[in-house]
Amino acid sequence: MIKLSNITKVFQQGARTIQALNNVSLHVPAGQIYGVIGASGAGKSTLIRCVNLLERPTEGSVMVGGQELTTLSESELTKARRQIGMIFQHFNLLSSRTVFGNVALPLELDNTPKEEIKRRVTELLDLVGLGDKHDSYPANLSGGQKQRVAIARALASNPKVLLCDEATSALDPATTRSILELLKDINRRLGLTILLITHEMDVVKRICDCVAVISNGELIEQDTVSEVFSHPKTPLAQKFIQSTLHLDIPEDYQARLKASPETDSVPMLRMEFTGQSVDAPLLSETARRFNVNNNIISAQMDYAGGVKFGIMLTEMHGTQEETQAAIAWLQDHHVKVEVLGYV
């Protein structure tokens, strides 16, 4: 549905040249939810704006629904953009218009008959859970409700593609979850192709089928969500995955934690499990093989793309030789082990 080929975007600021995107290629199949994740300034907003030519690429090809957009005339591009809805971090609603009026606006601009506008807007407001807010104004809505209005407006022209530019960044966690569930529901009901950009791996984990990691204007990793979470290939992908697992060292352990081993101290380990290593009884196996005992301090497990992954803090009790051998064995079995110190 979306195919970007060798996209390069260069901005000129006086004598200064800024390369925002460098030879980026991305394919989003029809009906998928595809996430692009990156830090601020990585180029993700520029990338998504190239899809509907809000930013015209310096080089490269933009195909949406089998149509090459970069060669279209202005009138042809305007028509093609009706198939591409877009929502933003800031809702961009017209304060002087009711909820109904905001959603109706693109239909009015397209000279849609009034009866059809009424039918379509009512249908969309029911879809996004705002069937009782027809006559409300944006000032009387919560942030989540405003984004729901923006989603309804973006769907007014029956687009095949929805672009989401940091659509949940301004929302609290609970509202973010509800908006993501709405997008997932719309994707399932309408078969809508969704391309979203974000700096939060929690967003990707919750609804995306595939994910690409962008850094300094280049896509450095892209695959299914389950594959990236199970076998991240780049340090940046690993960092984003770690950010979804929030496991702090308890205060009493922090007070006792030493950088070097002392008499009778034991190593404190941080272990990360992905894929098959999550379900395998690896800790009990190390106890049998190496005569070590693991005291689990805290642990957390989650799912992404149908794959389980988890993190654990433990004390490993045993001789230095046995604990080193046990750690090496765990690493051989796809567990990432970090010695945080000694307690």
UniProtKB/Swiss-Prot annotation:
Please report the record's description of how this protein sits within the membrane.
Answer: Peripheral membrane protein
Origin species: Salmonella paratyphi A (strain ATCC 9150 / SARB42)
Q: Which SUPFAM superfamilies match?
A: ACT-like (SSF55021), P-loop containing nucleoside triphosphate hydrolases (SSF52540)
Coiled-coil regions listed: none
Query: What does the record give as EC number?
Result: 7.4.2.11
Which family is it part of? Belongs to the ABC transporter superfamily. Methionine importer (TC 3.A.1.24) family.
Key words, A-Z: Amino-acid transport, ATP-binding, Cell inner membrane, Cell membrane, Membrane, Nucleotide-binding, Translocase, Transport
Subunit structure, interactors included: The complex is composed of two ATP-binding proteins (MetN), two transmembrane proteins (MetI) and a solute-binding protein (MetQ).
One matching Pfam family: ABC_tran
Provide the GO MF annotations for this entry.
ABC-type D-methionine transporter activity; ATP binding; ATP hydrolysis activity
Localization per Swiss-Prot or TrEMBL: Cell inner membrane
Q: For binding ATP, which residues are annotated in this chain's numbering?
A: G38, A39, S40, G41, A42, G43, K44, S45
What is this protein for, i.e. what is its function? Part of the ABC transporter complex MetNIQ involved in methionine import. Responsible for energy coupling to the transport system.
**Gene responsible for this protein:** metN1
Q: What is this protein called?
A: Methionine import ATP-binding protein MetN 1
Report domain ABC transporter positions. Answer: 2-241
